[in-house]
Amino acid sequence: MTIKLYNTKTRRKEDFEPINKDDVRMYVCGPTVYDRAHLGNARPVIVFDVLYRLLRHTYGPDHVTYVRNFTDVDDKINARAAESGRSIAEITAETTQWFLDDMAAVGALEPSIKDRDHQRAMPRATQYIAQMVTMIEDLIAKGHAYAAEGHVLFAVESYSKYGALSGRSIDDMIAGARVEVAPYKRNPMDFVLWKPSDDATPGWAGPVVGGKSIGRGRPGWHIECSAMAHDLLGATFDIHGGGNDLMFPHHENEIAQSTCAGHNFANVWMHNEMLQVEGKKMSKSLGNFFTVRDLLDQGVPGEVIRFVMLSTHYRKPMDWTEKKREEAEETLWKWKKLTDGAESSRRPHLEIIAALKDDLNTPLAISILHRKFAEAKSDDDKNRFLSTLLLLGIGETWRDGVDVAVEEAFQTVSLIEALIESIEKARAQKDWATSDRTRDGLESAGVKVQISKDGVSWERGPSFDPAKLEALK
């Protein structure tokens, strides 16, 4: 079955035909490294990690290149260094490692060039300044960029298709602009390729304009990805991915400057939708903002974070809720029990592969997994079930036995399930005292117990206390 992917550029689902099946190439915009990755930052990493795994499964690990950058030169980084009194190098090195650790915790493979070179597949912007300067000089020579007051700007009117990716016209963009336009811009929508740096700001020798350097400065955000993608993947590559919030202006600007530099750039553009928390936009002002590390430190396993993310299709808004987290922990606990002692057969279920090949339909894949779980009886069933989980990036820490948080979370669910079972048994024997005592104990530990004619169900409330639960053993 052919992989089908929704292409933002054409606004339709298309058969994916790589330029070269022996060298499938994908670029995904990475983080600006000045702080911890919040939960929304994890969504594109997880989404495109699933695509990376699918491409590796389809074409072979040695035939897929996946590049994801780090932006380590940015005004936010400069501001963080100034307010903290620490060096930029120290901050970017620390936050880069934080990101790598947190994304590994949610099961993301490191990007790699044909399964051989991880470091080059995770380029830092500061390593590619020379390539950026060369591209800027080329754009100036071709009449697509101009120098003004120490800046170099891209002239959007020189590119007739500007706005095609996001479906915007230049006139509408100008009319809707609410920020003051710099007086040195020829057009309000022209964007910065290079900007001057003072003595307190990182800087490099700038592009040569009219036979001399424009002066010390630093690159604009958009030129970074174009230069790194071109250097590592070539003038034309297969897939470019990122969050929906990057479609404009970042990806729109990438396309404009790359095309005008003579590069066809990416054939397929993919965007994941944004994340909400309990139905609301995640923000510090609403008190619902948290990082991936916050969840991990609270004992939420990375496998659970990943599972919740994959339960919603990547092109739909993802709503993170406590209920979904609890349901994910219960499901993964049962699946872990099934696969204890299993060995990967390297034969994932074909139905799951078909779901993933249909524009990464992970919700359908998970619904099929629920059915396969119920049907699994033989060792071969369990081995194939584990193989399928591994294709989705789930179950690797179970097999390696290294994730303490996962084990603790599953032990918690196991204890609650055992206590619920004792309530059901006591009620069947009309031992109301034992039933009430156990239920009261669970309630005091923050576990809400509901008893109905259909049986006993439970969910963890906001006051859940693991220590009180442990005391009920």
From Swiss-Prot:
Subcellular location: Cytoplasm
Highest taxon of the lineage: Bacteria
EC numbers, comma separated: 6.1.1.16
InterPro entries reported for this sequence: Cys-tRNA-ligase, Cys-tRNA/MSH_ligase, Rossmann-like_a/b/a_fold, tRNA-synt_1_cat_dom, tRNAsynth_Ia_anticodon-bd
Similarity-based family: Belongs to the class-I aminoacyl-tRNA synthetase family.
Binding site for Zn(2+): C29, C225, H250, E254
Alphabetically ordered keywords of this record: Aminoacyl-tRNA synthetase, ATP-binding, Cytoplasm, Ligase, Metal-binding, Nucleotide-binding, Protein biosynthesis, Zinc
Amino-acid positions noted as binding ATP in the UniProt annotation, renumbered to this chain: K284
Self-association state and partner proteins as the record states: Monomer.
Organism: Roseobacter denitrificans (strain ATCC 33942 / OCh 114)
UniProt short sequence motif 'KMSKS' region, positions renumbered to this chain: 281-285
Catalysed reactions, as listed in the record: tRNA(Cys) + L-cysteine + ATP = L-cysteinyl-tRNA(Cys) + AMP + diphosphate
Cofactor binding note of this UniProt entry: Binds 1 zinc ion per subunit.
GO cellular component: cytosol
Gene Ontology molecular function terms on file: ATP binding; cysteine-tRNA ligase activity; zinc ion binding
Cofactor: Zn(2+)
Protein name, per record: Cysteine--tRNA ligase
Pfam families on file: tRNA-synt_1e
Location (main, coarse): cytoplasm
Lineage: Bacteria, Pseudomonadati, Pseudomonadota, Alphaproteobacteria, Rhodobacterales
Database matches in SUPFAM superfamilies: Anticodon-binding domain of a subclass of class I aminoacyl-tRNA synthetases (SSF47323), Nucleotidylyl transferase (SSF52374)
GO BP annotations, alphabetical order: cysteinyl-tRNA aminoacylation
Keyword Nucleotide-binding: yes
Motif ('HIGH' region): 31-41
